[in-house]
UniProtKB/Swiss-Prot annotation:
Family listed: Belongs to the HEATR1/UTP10 family.
Taxonomic lineage of the native organism: Eukaryota, Metazoa, Ecdysozoa, Nematoda, Chromadorea
InterPro entries the UniProt entry points to: ARM-like, ARM-type_fold, BP28_C_dom, HEAT_Utp10/HEAT1, U3snoRNP10_N, UTP10
Keyword Ribonucleoprotein: yes
Name listed for the protein in its UniProt record: HEAT repeat-containing protein 1 homolog
Molecular functions per Gene Ontology: snoRNA binding
Subcellular location: Nucleus, Nucleolus
Entry GO terms, CC: 90S preribosome; small-subunit processome; t-UTP complex
Stretches assigned to coiled coil: none
Length: 1650
């Protein structure tokens, strides 16, 4: 019954009913709940209107009447729940339309503003919840949709479709599409039904056109959801298909294009996923054909093809076929099918279609039989698009029908189509003919005759004639065709066969081939001419050498005239080329053949003066020759010339060829003659490659013409030929080619050279490579020396550099790689240096600072840098390293600002690269700096790093070891060079000094990269070798040692091992540690040895960190012994050295729990504590604040770069002046982390130093957050051993936080004695004591989380000790530090003490903690005695402070301890009232204004009032007796004006106390109020004034509740309205105004008359 009733009530719970409840639900899309509660109707309306105005600018559809109506001013206070059903339905229509129009813009903030108004005013989150859910569902993966779901008032449990969304509303996370897809399958596809219905409903509201234009995301989501159902083919069952088919049908029939496309995509995916039954397939095909629309006809037919390809469709229904034949006029089905046939396989479709068409054509009763034949003919009209299977199918169908008596008469087009198919697909035709011939040979013959394709049978038979048997050969004599067949032997057969061969029957050529050919040309006997041409080709050059030149030229002219210009096709061009390939042609004759003789042509050669015989070519072709004929002649002649191995060459021939190229360039339609250009350019290239005796120079090679052709051509073959021509020309005229080479590099022009495609780029790339190789190696017949080759390379590279900035950025890589392949690794660095030199030669210093900054990394430098980096990237990594080394050495050879005196041959090449004598000093400096910067970029190149990483350890050692030591040496030399130049600056030139400092920094970066780029294995070997040399050699290279140690540090610190694959061998690490131990000595004199000791300590620290933990190691034990020995002498040693050794010792303690570390832990800790104490003494505030910068303490200043390096850790980070302190703290922390139980006796000293450092370097409250054991900072700092990375206070704070963490883990039983000692030691240091109690509070909280029971028992035992020996001795500070400037600090100290007491209270029960409170009360209570001294009386202040802190933390839980404290508060108020107590002896506390005594008295009164005020909050505790106890003293405080701060005390503290007392005892409030009003009759104006202030504030607190007490107030106010003191009168008027504001104007008029 209960269940039924619940169900009925739930059904009645409508949206309107829910909004009629007492509490209105505050819902917002843009604001959180707290802000939504404050959102007024007017504000929501303004937000909505602002959003609507913005949406109108985005989409004009929002500028409509209904929108204005929805957003009108009248709707501000609209209450939807009061609407009737009809009005609500009408409103729903308006809202649904607006939501549909908003949905595409959900992620626009203006849309969210509109939704905010609709949610607030129309409660659409409840009334239109499902509409909101569906409308914006396509945005399910956005945050805003998640927020929208969260605010919906939707019954998720009752909705089977959307129940899955409830889990996402709780977390407010976006909904993945996979979740929706799973829910769709689990809900039996009802979600798809909902979305489809939503789309239909949307069409009814906004129309299909609007929906299709504005909501593509909705259709995409619908289709995507449908497709998701096919991801698992096993789940596609009958039920799913039954659900899907209606969606598909509705989609195909839909007038909306997007819906149709969605349905087609679903069909395609469905047929690809599963095999469908025939009835389903027929239904789909029928839908696609019968519901085809013009705008999606191509897509429908494409989908149909997919169905036929993937499924086995056997037939089409008659009605479907008729619909296909009688399609709409706007749909050209057969044209679309033809286009599809060219792109995809349509075999299955046409096989079925043709079969159905033939069946329909036989139906005499059908009106479509003729149309079927027409369509059949149209679909087989183009045989070129048919496949073999299609051809076989159509041939078999038509021939089979013919054999069955169904001949398509009077269809000439069909006969021609069948014939074309049979000819094109002879093999298929032959197979079908053989198949049908076996059935009925005679009938088939008649059918073939009827279709007039009998000859195709013979054609097909000949095609397979090769399969005839050779067992018997029938030889029939030509002269005796009727002779009998003779059976011959094998030898006789062979002899007869040879005699009957074509070779035996060949006629023997007699006579001169040229004369015969000329005779046959005139007689147009073309086969004979070709015979003669073949004879010429066989006779070859010997034949032509015996012929007269004029005869040969005359014959060539005849051939050109007949074949080239006349266009005779019977003569094969190949025969002509072969025949004339050996002819010795005069270069002048060749030039004439390529010339047009019209008297005005620009390409005609100049004639010499005097009489001259008429040119034979001109005589043949005349001056009236058309350009078309001339072009035909030129193409033919060029074709002949290109067929020759060597073309007759001369200056005139080259000029004529270039003239042909130019003539084509001058045409508007250049591409139509690209073949002619192609032939001409190839001919020029052949001449340049084989010039014979012709001298070719710059004047003969028209490079301008070639470049112009390259710029304008769109033919990649011609482009390739032109680039090859440039390479060939480079052998003869390198200077001219180089001058024009810019166009090659910069891709100028508007033709194909400009295109960004692989073909163009590969052509240019190969050309550039060949060009460089050719120019470098070409020098006539002489063999170039190495230096000559380098000189030519420098010259070419400099010319290339001039055009480098014009090369597009995306093409630079390929060009640079091509150059790298040409110049090889040995010359790569030279090219790079020339590039940089060219850039710096053009560089100008800008006077404008902003422009100079912009020029630092301008586009020009980017271009040069990119080319250089890509050029080197083409080399293998070891070649790259070698090239970079050469560049570094070049920089070093270049020298400083002053040039070197001596020069060598090597210097000559250096000068060619960069001639410093021809450059200004700024450019020399810039060149040097740019080279070093470029080297840095090369080392940072990811390609180099990845290639090195691809090698294994063995290959790296083999290839890189020879380079390794040189890399180290080079880095040292670079460093020393920069250091020397920087130190040589005397300061007279600030600009030079700045430059060399910057250059030194840059070289340092390069040096580091040089070293650190070395692979791990090579680095390990180098480090071992160098250190061994340093140990064995008396003249140790400390500089080299420093570098290798830095390398070791990077490898150990970053990679954690030296070998990438196998990891470093433990034995090798120990060996390295043994070598380094020798440098760990207490050095005080040699700076190099001191620096070496520091570096070795750092490296040993990393080794200790990476070595496996060992119980005992002789090497590390020796290291530990050395560390302790050095640290013990810290007063004589450098602080940085001592700090590094301390870090090493700390790491040994942390990483290796050995006997030696335990043994030395105590002595090491004592030394660390001593150093910390000295640091604390040294870091006294005045001295510390005035201390010099860290760098100033180092001798030599910035001028000595070695000293600057010394101030840095090996990681490159600066040490501060507190280095030793940080290192000592680190070591202390390590000791306490590992061996706290062994060094218990030093705990007190550690705590003392910890507290003093906290007092000096940071506020404890700020550090508290750092030191929580559960905080993320603990985890972040756990693994670090370096301290130098933390600067100054940050590093100290970090170490102090870690020490605090260690102290928090010490057992409580050992702490009390140390805490008591600490309190005694720090009794005069307030900040240090605050740090101590912060530590104790943290300790209690930490232990309470980890060991609550053990802690509770320990605290119970130690609570009295804590009060007597820790807490109360600290609170005495108030009586000892009685200075005004320390007053606030004392308060802060007490606050930290009481925080500790409160932390104890949190773990004890009420009874257990009462002992602590009683102890404190007993400690303070003697201060109330008359004879008590000032120190005892000040204890009362501390007690009241504690009471208020206790209440703040525990509220009402603190009241059980307030009994006696409340009484003490009343007594304090009474005994501190200087107005009522006339004698000073009777006063508890008193003092003159501005004195410390006045501050203490004011504080005591304030705390006492607050105690009473806090107690009065709780009626149960604040009984009538207690109310009476405090009422008089509280009211009497009104007259206590003699104590400083009276007015503030009254307004801020006294008024709340009185108000709360009145609330606690309402019956006594009138009496209390009357006592207050009686104070207004005091003779002292100040008291009257203060009483009125209290009254005014009290009325504000009470509010309307003051009305019952007006009868008490009015008489007193009447008296005061005309007070003799103007200030009192004004304050009285303010009180009256306040009452008038509450009770009206008539209030006071009535009261005054009364």
């Amino acid at each position: 019954m209960a269940t039924s009733l619940t169900s009925q009530l739930e059904n009645l719970r409508t949206s309107a009913a829910r909004h009629l409840t007492v509490e209105k639900r505050h819902v917002s899309l843009l604001f959180d709940r707290k802000e939504a509660n404050k959102l007024s109707n007017e504000t929501a309306h303004r937000i909505g209107v602002a959003g609507l105005e913005q949406m109108k600018r985005i989409d004009p559809v929002f500028d409509t009447e209904f929108a204005n109506d929805l957003f009108s001013e009248e709707r501000v206070d609209f209450v939807r729940s009061m609407l009737e059903k009809g009005a609500n339905e009408e409103l729903n229509k308006q809202i649904e339309k607006l939501l549909l129009e908003l949905s595409p813009y959900l992620q626009h903030f203006a849309c969210q503003q509109v939704l905010e108004f609709l949610i607030h005013t129309y409660q659409i989150y409840s009334f239109n919840a499902e509409t909101l859910l569906l409308t914006f569902l396509p945005f399910h993966e956005t945050k805003v949709y998640s927020r929208l779901l969260r605010i919906l008032d939707f019954d998720w449990k009752r909705s089977k479709e959307w129940q899955f969304m409830q889990q996402f509303t709780k977390t407010e996370t976006p909904i993945p599409f996979t979740s929706i897809a799973r829910a769709t399958l689990s809900s039996k596809h009802s979600i798809i039904t909902c979305i489809t219905d939503h789309i239909r409903h949307a069409v009814e509201i906004v129309g299909s056109d609007y929906l299709e234009i504005k909501h593509p995301i909705l259709f995409n989501f619908h289709a995507k959801l449908l497709l998701s159902m096919f991801t698992d083919p096993e789940k596609v069952d009958e039920m799913m298909l039954a659900k899907l088919m209606p969606f598909i049908e509705n989609g195909i029939k839909s007038p909306m294009k997007s819906f149709r496309y969605s349905a087609m995509v679903v069909i395609s995916q469905l047929v690809l996923t599963v095999k469908l039954k025939d009835e389903v397939l027929n239904s789909m095909c029928k839908l696609l054909i019968t519901k085809m629309r013009s705008d999606t006809a191509a897509a429908s037919l494409s989908t149909l093809m997919v169905v036929f390809q993937q499924q086995n469709v056997q037939s089409l229904s008659k009605n479907t076929l008729k619909k296909l034949l009688r399609h709409e006029e706007g749909i050209d089905v057969w044209k679309i099918l033809k286009e599809l046939s060219e792109r995809t396989d349509t075999t299955k479709f046409f096989n079925v279609l043709w079969k159905e068409l033939i069946v329909l054509s036989k139906d005499a009763e059908s009106e479509d039989n003729t149309l079927a034949i027409d369509v059949l003919i149209e679909t087989i009209e183009d045989a070129s698009i048919l496949t073999g299977d299609q051809a076989g199918t159509i041939l078999k169908l038509i021939l089979q029908e013919g054999m069955d008596g169904n001949i398509f008469d009077n269809k000439k087009k069909l006969k021609s189509n069948i014939r074309a198919i049979g000819m094109r697909f002879a093999k298929q035709f032959d197979a079908i003919h053989a198949e049908l011939k076996a059935k009925d040979k005679k009938t088939l013959k008649n059918v073939l005759k009827e279709y007039q394709i009998e000859d195709i049978v013979q054609f097909a038979s000949e095609a397979v004639a090769a399969t005839q048997s050779e067992e018997s050969i029938e030889i029939i004599s030509e002269e005796a065709p009727s002779s009998k067949k003779i059976k011959l032997t094998a030898s006789e057969k062979a002899q007869k066969l040879a005699q009957s061969s074509e070779f035996a029957k060949r006629e023997v050529f007699s006579g001169d081939p040229i004369n015969k050919a000329t005779e046959w040309l005139n007689g147009e006997k073309w086969d004979k001419v070709e015979w003669a041409l073949n004879e010429m080709a066989q006779r070859g050059e010997k034949y032509f050498s015996r012929k007269v030149e004029d005869d040969v030229e005359q014959f060539v002219l005849e051939i050109v005239k007949v074949v080239g210009v006349g266009g005779v096709k019977q003569i094969d061009g190949g025969s002509v080329k072969a025949a004339l390939a050996g002819a010795n042609l005069n270069p002048q004759f060749v030039a004439d053949l390529l010339t047009k003789f019209d008297g005005v042509s620009e390409i005609a050669p100049k004639r010499t003066k005097g009489a001259q015989k008429k040119n034979l070519v001109e005589k043949t072709f005349g001056t009236e020759e058309s350009w078309e004929a001339f072009n035909q002649r030129v193409v033919f002649v060029l074709d002949l010339l290109n067929a020759r191995q060597i073309i007759p060459s001369s200056e005139k021939v080259l000029a004529a060829l270039f003239a042909v190229v130019k003539q084509v360039n001058s045409k508007s339609d250049v591409e139509s003659s690209s073949y002619q250009q192609h032939l001409a350019v190839n001919a020029i290239r052949k001449i340049l490659e084989h010039p014979e005796k012709t001298k070719i120079g710059a004047s003969e090679v028209d490079m301008d013409c070639v470049i112009e052709t390259m710029r304008s051509t769109h033919n990649h073959h011609l482009l390739r030929d032109c680039l090859r021509l440039i390479v060939a020309a480079a052998k003869h005229t390198p200077n001219s080619v180089v001058k024009h080479v810019m166009s090659v590099f910069t891709f100028m022009g508007n033709g194909m050279l400009r295109k960004d495609n692989e073909l163009t780029l590969s052509i240019v790339e190969k050309t550039v490579e060949s060009l460089f190789s050719t120019i470098i190696n070409s020098s006539g017949q002489a063999v170039l020396t190495k230096q000559q080759q380098t000189e030519k390379l420098i010259e070419l590279a400099r010319l290339f550099a001039a055009s480098a900035i014009d090369i597009p950025a995306h093409r630079r890589a390929r060009i640079a790689q091509a150059i790298a392949r040409a110049v090889q690794a040995e010359n790569a660095s030279t090219v790079v240096l020339v590039l940089v030199s060219s850039f710096c030669a053009r560089w100008q210093r800008s006077s404008d600072a902003a422009a100079q900054e912009a020029m630092k990394r301008g586009s020009d430098q980017d271009a040069y840098d990119d080319l250089a980096i890509e050029l080197l990237s083409a080399l293998n990594p070891f070649e790259q390293l070698s090239s970079v080394l050469e560049m570094c050495e070049y920089v070093r050879r270049l020298g400083g600002d002053k040039p070197a005196k001596s020069t060598t041959t090597k210097k000559d090449l250096d000068t060619m690269i960069f001639d410093r004598t021809a450059q200004t000093l700024p450019r020399i400096r810039h060149f040097r700096y740019v080279v070093v910067t470029l080297i840095s970029r090369i080392f940072s190149n990811r390609v180099l790093i990845e290639r090195l990483a691809a090698y294994d350890d063995e290959e790296l050692l083999k290839n890189a070891l020879p380079l390794g030591k040189r890399l180290i040496e080079c880095s040292v030399e670079l460093d020393e060079f920069a250091n020397k130049e920087a130190n040589d600056q005397d300061g007279s030139d600030p600009q030079a000094q700045r430059y060399w400092v910057a250059f030194a920094s840059r070289t340092e970066v390069v040096s580091e990269k040089l070293r650190h780029l070395l692979p791990g294995g090579v680095a390990a070997r180098l480090i071992a070798d160098v250190l061994q040399e340093c140990v064995n050699d008396k003249k140790m290279s400390y500089k080299m040692c420093e570098k290798v140690l830095q390398l070791a540090n990077i490898k150990l610190g970053h990679d954690r091992y030296l070998f990438a694959d196998s990891g470093i061998n433990e034995k090798e690490l120990i060996t390295l540690a043994q070598a380094l131990n020798k440098f760990i000595v207490a050095e005080t004199k040699s700076e190099e040895k001191m620096r070496m000791c520091q570096n070795s300590a750092y490296t040993l620290k990393l080794i200790a960190k990476n070595l496996p933990s060992q119980s005992e190691s002789l090497v590390l034990a020796d290291t530990m012994q050395r560390c302790v020995s050095i640290v013990s002498q810290y007063q004589k040693l450098d602080e940085n050295l001592t700090g590094n050794v301390l870090l090493l010792a700390g790491e040994l303690i942390r990483s290796h729990n050995m006997r030696s570390t335990i043994h030395h832990a105590t002595s090491l800790l004592k030394t660390c504590l001593a150093t910390v104490q000295e640091c604390i003494a040294r870091f006294s505030k005045p001295q510390y604040d005035s201390a010099a910068s860290p760098g100033s303490s180092v001798a030599g200043g910035r001028g000595n770069r070695g000293h600057r390096i010394r101030q840095q850790s090996l990681g490159g980070n600066k040490f501060g002046s507190d280095t030793l302190l940080i290192c000592s703290l680190t070591c202390i922390q390590r000791v306490y982390d590992q061996f706290a139980s062994f060094v218990v006796e030093s705990t007190g000293d550690v705590i003392i130093r910890y507290c003093r450092l906290i007092a000096r370097f940071g506020d404890p409250s700020e550090l508290l957050a750092l030191n929580q054991p559960s905080s993320s900072t603990t985890a972040a700092f756990q693994g670090g051993s370096q301290t130098s990375g933390f600067g100054s206070k940050t590093g100290i704070h970090h170490r102090l936080s870690l020490i605090r963490r260690s102290l928090l883990s010490i057992e409580l039983r050992v702490l009390p004695a140390h805490i008591v000692k600490t309190v005694g030691e720090l009794k005069t240091e307030k900040k240090a004591l605050s740090a101590l109690f912060n530590l104790l509070t943290g300790y209690i909280e930490t232990q309470h989380q980890q060991k609550p029971e053990i802690l509770r028992k320990s605290v119970i035992q130690l609570r009295r000790t804590f009060v007597s020996d820790v807490i109360t001795p600290t609170l005495i500070v108030r009586s000892q530090e009685r200075q005004s400037d320390q007053f606030e600090n004392v308060e802060k100290l007490e606050h930290t003490v009481f925080n500790f007491v409160i932390s104890i209270a949190s773990i004890l029960s009420e009874v257990e903690f009462r002992t602590v409170v009683n102890e404190l009360v007993a400690w303070a209570e003697p201060g109330l005695e008359a004879k008590a001294d000032l120190a005892a009386r000040l204890r009362l202040v501390s007690l009241l402070h504690f009471a208020n802190d206790l209440y703040t933390s525990f509220n009402s839980l603190a009241l059980p301890y307030f009994g006696r404290i409340l009484e003490i508060s009343a007594l304090v108020l009474k005994k501190c009232n200087a107005t009522l107590l006339l004698g000073t002896d009777e006063l508890l506390l008193s003092g003159k204004r501005g004195s410390i005594e006045a501050l203490e008295t004011d504080l005591a009164l304030t705390l006492a009032i607050d105690v009473i005020s806090n107690a009065a909050r709780h009626r149960d505790f604040f009984t009538v007796d207690r109310c009476q106890l405090v009422s008089d003293v509280i009211v009497n405080e009104l007259v206590n004006t003699k104590v400083e701060g009276h007015e503030k005390r009254c307004s801020d503290h006294l008024v709340p106390a009185i108000y709360r007392i009145g609330n606690a005892d309402p019956d006594s409030f009138p009496e209390l109020l009357n006592k207050i009003m009686l104070k207004t009759r005091d003779s002292r104006a100040k008291i009257r004034y203060r009483a009125l202030i209290v009254l005014e504030l009290l009325i504000k607190e009470i509010g309307d509740g003051v009305q019952p007490h007006l009868s008490i107030l009015l008489p007193f106010l009447n008296e005061l309205i005309e007070d003799e003191n103007k200030q009192v009168e004004a304050q009285c008027q303010k009180v009256i105004n306040s009452l008038q504001h509450k009770f009206g104007e008539t209030f006071w008029s009535g009261g005054s008359s009364a």
